[in-house]
């Protein structure tokens, strides 16, 4: 799994203790890793993601999950990557930024992973990753006493405000920053603002031991 891949990568880097930032699929993958190694996590930054079960996805993703049509749109036409360059931000991306997002998926063979990711969104108990997501959700409480910062793009059509509210049920003491004019790729919409938020949070919470 991607959790195993992340585990191997962090082990290779020999990281003993670090701050964890999760976004999109990084939510379940990052928390899946963190729950295996809670002693390594100093603090956590969460942005526009979910690491818990939910029973709603946007119509656009439902289309992408259709067995034959979804695969054709993603793998043959590369529409998932192309649409991501203008449907995930509130401000137009520069040409070179768009090209950077599309570059890893120029070949049809390189899009199979994208197709698999979309198909693997665990909505129902019978789906492949659902049980693992439930396990991750049940482990979220482990980090309730850690410093947690939530940064949320409020104009995200996919990870909507209802998911931000869910996060606050798990981490009611979290520091929250709502970025009003940012979409799903909030780091593209408001890079300087978010850089300042993250830098300030890390300076104030450089070590879990100090906070305790």
What do the predicted segments below correspond to?
Residues 16-56:
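Conserved hydrolase catalytic core segment
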Residues 56-116:
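Helix-rich cap/lid subdomain of alpha/beta-hydrolase
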Residues 110-169:
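Conserved serine/cysteine hydrolase catalytic core
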Residues 173-212:
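Catalytic active-site module of serine/aspartate enzymes centered on a nucleophile-bearing elbow/loop
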């Amino acid at each position: 799994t991607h959790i195993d891949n992340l585990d191997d990568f962090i082990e290779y880097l020999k990281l003993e203790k670090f701050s964890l930032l999760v976004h999109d699929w990084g939510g379940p993958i990052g928390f899946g890793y963190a729950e295996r190694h809670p002693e390594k996590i100093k603090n956590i930054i969460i942005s526009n993601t979910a690491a818990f079960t939910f029973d709603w996805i946007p119509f656009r993703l439902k289309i992408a999950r259709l067995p034959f049509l979804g695969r054709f749109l993603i793998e043959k036409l590369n529409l998932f990557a192309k649409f991501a360059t203008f449907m995930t931000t509130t401000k137009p991306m520069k040409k070179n930024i768009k090209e950077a997002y599309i570059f890893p998926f120029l070949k049809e063979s390189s899009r199979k992973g994208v197709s698999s990711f979309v198909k693997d969104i665990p909505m129902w108990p019978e789906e492949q990753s659902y049980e693992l997501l439930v396990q991750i959700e049940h482990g979220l409480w482990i980090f309730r006493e850690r410093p947690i910062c939530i940064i949320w793009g409020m104009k995200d059509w996919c990870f909507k405000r209802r998911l931000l509210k869910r996060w606050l049920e798990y981490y009611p003491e979290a520091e929250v920053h709502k970025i009003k004019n940012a979409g799903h790729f909030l780091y593209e919409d408001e890079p300087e603002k978010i850089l300042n938020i993250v830098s300030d949070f890390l300076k104030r919470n450089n070590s879990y031991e100090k906070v305790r």
